[in-house]
């Protein structure tokens, strides 16, 4: 989400307080060791590791004519989103004025970890192909379900200390897939929203 993080670690009382930010938290299986791994994300839908343990997500835009972001998540990183950006007008909005939603540019703030690219329209399901069951064509691909009723496959290559998006093709069209995952058999499964209109106030 992106409404904020506020938690106190039980073992030592350390407080993690990041109001108005989405983030990635890390915790041990027994509930200990809570920490905020990365922050400043705008409602990321799912996280995915590649085969080397690099972590990625696709988060949402601010509905200002900006674009969704394909993000490489680094420990300690800040991707720039604050919930109050969404409630400010265009003529005084840090999100737009400082280009926090765009890939790396020289005049962006130094604290920002810029996205790899601007990509997708309403990201939903996101997963990385962990094996070979889908054939050679789809090895080392991320799969992303869009709210525009299409699912695409994308690839990345290292680019300095980050990555660049190097390929994309459509693998499915016409189904409103909102979640995807790989099963133990190596197949890719999706959950379909069908044709129910999206309503943020739906019970």
Model-derived regions: residue spans:
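Beta-propeller domains with acidic blade repeats across secreted/periplasmic ectodomains
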Residues: 1-203
């Amino acid at each position: 989400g992106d409404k904020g993080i506020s938690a106190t670690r039980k073992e030592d009382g350390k407080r993690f307080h990041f109001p108005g930010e989405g983030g990635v938290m890390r915790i041990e299986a027994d509930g200990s060791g809570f920490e905020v791994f990365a922050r400043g994300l705008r409602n990321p839908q799912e996280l995915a590791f590649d085969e080397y343990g690099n972590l990625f997500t696709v988060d949402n835009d601010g509905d200002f004519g900006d674009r969704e972001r394909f993000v490489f998540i680094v420990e300690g990183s800040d991707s720039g989103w604050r919930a109050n950006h969404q409630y400010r007008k265009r003529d005084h909005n840090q999100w737009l004025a400082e280009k926090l939603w765009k890939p790396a540019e020289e005049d962006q703030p130094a604290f920002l970890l810029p996205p790899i690219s601007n990509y997708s329209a309403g990201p939903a399901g996101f997963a990385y192909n962990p094996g070979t069951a889908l054939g050679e064509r789809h090895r080392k691909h991320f799969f992303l379900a869009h709210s525009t009723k299409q699912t695409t496959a994308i690839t990345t290559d290292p680019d300095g200390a980050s990555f660049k998006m190097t390929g994309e093709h459509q693998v499915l069209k016409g189904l409103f897939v909102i979640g995807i995952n790989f099963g133990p058999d190596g197949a890719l499964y999706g959950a379909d929203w069908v044709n129910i209109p999206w309503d943020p106030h739906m019970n």
